[in-house]
A protein has these predicted regions:
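Interhelical loop/hinge segments that connect adjacent transmembrane helices in multipass membrane
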Residues: 1-16, 186-187, 202-242, 281, ...
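Membrane-proximal transmembrane or re-entrant/amphipathic helices at the cytosolic face
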Residues: 2-6, 446-541, 547, 559, ...
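C-terminal transmembrane helix end/exit motif
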Residues: 2-3, 72-75, 149-153, 157, ...
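Signature of the first transmembrane helix
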Residues: 3, 11-73, 103-114, 172, ...
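Transmembrane helical elements of multi-pass membrane transporters/channels
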Residues: 19-34, 167, 189-204, 208, ...
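Specific pore-lining/lateral-gate transmembrane helices of multi-pass inner-membrane transport
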Residues: 80-97, 260-376, 497
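Interfacial segments at transmembrane-helix termini and the short loops linking adjacent helices
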Residues: 114-134, 255, 319-350, 456-460
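Hydrophobic alpha-helical transmembrane segments
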Residues: 128, 132, 161-209, 227, ...
């Protein structure tokens, strides 16, 4: 097997898809089931109560930046420096001490002074215990970052997702019990979070406990700190960009406005969930191809287009069916005004995803020292806009300020990355998907206005109006096709998929043909597996003696891997043709 094929076998599209799907499934199910708690929160908590919860969680996120010390990044960076088990165990041990002793000191001091701190944040007394419970949850959550990061570094997505499912199984019922049965309100939510984090942390200890040396490697610790601490400043200015608007809303509008904005933020999270799943698997996937820069650039460009298409499609669906989304996930009428803010925040997350895509070039060229500067510029713009417009316009101004900040951040990141590692991103296709999304959302709004749709109407009327708008959602793929979004290679693969679907009704004939080609692998009593059918089609279309040999070996795992290589070859060839100018 060639070196190229060996590399592909260890880190090809199959690995990216598998890891993204598994990480994403765990995260998305967790977020989905957590979203199911939103009707509970909006029924048992007032907007003001939800605002208190939002302020507690945002403040905890700020504290997390200081407590983490950037060691999540350092862990990933130094773990691969020494490929021996002993060397990696030293890294794990250092991370363990940073995740336990240092946070215990910092969080303990904050807990002592929290009555005074919370009095300033909330403009009144009586909130200290809420924040102290959140600090306890932060301690165990930060500690559990060690095993969860280790699962990802060692490509154990199933184990990672098992803990995500366990979080759901514990946190959801416990929160429902405390909020509904014991009427504990915000306190019940925070207790449920803390108990869940403690339980998961305790359960994860056996997965790495034997690898701890309990002796700090001082020299290694100095290097890790030198690498990690600069990231703290970046994280702080990034916090300002993403979350500081809550403090402005609290200052000028109060807890109720913070609660509504927090609701809108929760409703806008589907795109963020997709980005989180993708960013967990994407870096280790494309960095494995750096030995061939031209190939690496093509693969990054094409895969980022598909990722952005997913994000834009999710934003489009959110915009089209916003009234239904609000009515399904919020209970009280006092929460139903968050639609416009939700859509704007979803757009800001799409821009955040674009920033993440553009970051590749700076990472490859090791030019990340400029990231704190450009993040500070974007954050300064965000703060300035918040100061100028939040006092008058409230949460919609906060949302648009976030959009402006992320737009500037993405633009600056693109400029830095392209200067040092030029990637031919598919700008024409990105613009086309943006135009298609905008026109689709505009059409949905026009239909809503024409039919008199109102989010405050009886639920049956809302459902009826959403049915009127359902065909509008089809505009998005139709516009993509009309605008020439698809490349020739993609149209060819779609046509091939359509041919396969048309052949499926004739299953006996297909099975017989498979039996003739594959021998005992396909009979009426033992029909071909879906993977075998893919291999047969790949062999027929790829051509050549080597491919026919692969099809003949279709029974085992080796063939599955080789067939995946053929599939990836087709993808790479299509990407290369497109980048060579066959399409725009």
């Amino acid at each position: 097997m060639s070196e190229r094929k060996a590399t592909r076998a260890s880190g090809g599209y199959g690995l990216l898809l598998k890891d993204s799907a598994i990480y994403g499934a765990g995260r998305m199910l967790q977020k989905f089931l957590s979203a199911l708690l939103l009707p509970l929160y909006t029924y048992f908590l007032s907007p003001a109560d939800y605002g208190v919860l939002g302020m507690v969680l945002v403040t905890t996120a700020l504290i997390d930046v200081v407590v983490t010390l950037g060691f999540d990044v350092a862990f990933s960076r130094f773990y691969f420096d020494d490929k021996t088990e002993e060397g990696r165990n030293r890294v794990i041990t250092n991370v363990f001490w940073i995740d336990t002793v240092y946070p215990a000191v910092v969080l303990g001091l904050l807990a002592v002074f929290m009555p005074q701190i919370s009095n300033v944040l909330m403009k009144g007394p009586g909130y200290a215990l809420y924040f102290q419970l959140a600090l306890l949850n932060e301690f165990f959550t930060n500690w559990s970052d060690l095993p969860f990061t280790l699962f990802r570094l060692e490509h154990k997505p199933w184990k990672f997702s098992a803990f995500m499912f366990a979080r759901i199984a514990i946190q959801i019922p416990l929160t429902v019990l405390l909020v509904v049965s014991f009427h504990m309100g915000v306190m019940g939510v925070l207790i449920g979070n803390a108990v869940t984090s403690f339980t998961l942390n305790a359960a994860s200890l056996p997965t790495y406990w034997r690898r701890l040396a309990f002796k700090v490697d001082v020299d290694l610790m100095k290097k890790m700190l030198a690498f990690a601490i600069p990231a703290v400043f970046t994280a702080l200015v990034f916090f300002i960009l993403k979350l500081s608007d809550r403090y402005f809303l609290m200052r000028y509008w109060g807890k109720t406005q913070v609660g509504l904005y927090t609701t809108a933020f929760t409703l806008s999270e589907p795109v963020y969930m997709a980005m989180t799943a993708f960013r967990m698997a994407w870096p280790q996937w494309h960095y494995a191809k750096l030995d061939d820069p031209q190939r690496h650039k093509r693969m990054v460009s094409r895969s980022s287009t598909y990722f952005m298409l997913l994000c834009v499609a999710m934003m489009t669906v959110t915009g089209v069916f916003m009234p239904l989304l609000i009515r399904l996930l919020t209970s009280r009428q006092s929460f139903w005004s968050v639609g416009p803010t939700t859509l704007v925040l979803t757009f800001s997350t799409v821009l955040y995803s674009l920033y993440f895509v553009f970051w590749v070039g700076a990472n490859v060229a090791k030019k990340n020292r400029q990231i704190p500067l450009i993040t500070a510029v974007a954050s300064a713009l965000n703060v300035g806009l918040n100061l100028a417009f939040i006092p008058r316009y409230g949460m919609i101004a906060a949302a648009w300020s976030t959009v402006a900040g992320f737009a500037v951040l993405a633009a600056l990141m693109y400029r830095i990355s392209q200067r040092h590692y030029r990637i031919a991103f598919e700008w024409a296709r990105l613009v086309k998907m943006g135009v298609a999304s905008g026109l689709t959302i505009l059409a949905a709004w026009t239909v809503a206005q024409a039919t008199g749709e109102s989010v405050r109407a009886p639920f049956g009327d809302v459902m009826l109006h959403e049915l009127y708008k359902a065909p509008v959602a089809l505009l998005f793929p139709l516009l993509l096709y009309a605008l020439g979004f698809l490349t020739p290679g993609e149209r060819e693969r779609l046509a091939r998929a359509a041919r396969r679907l048309r052949r499926r009704p004739a299953m006996p004939a297909a099975a017989a043909a498979g039996a003739a080609t594959l021998g005992d692998a396909a009979t009426f009593d033992n029909p071909p597996r879906p993977g075998a059918r893919r291999r047969e089609d790949a062999a027929a279309e790829a051509g050549g003696a080597e491919t026919e040999r692969l099809a003949a070996e279709a029974g085992g795992a080796e063939t599955e891997r080789l067939a995946a290589e053929i599939e990836e070859d087709e993808f790479e060839d299509a990407a290369a043709r497109d980048h060579d100018g066959e399409t725009v």
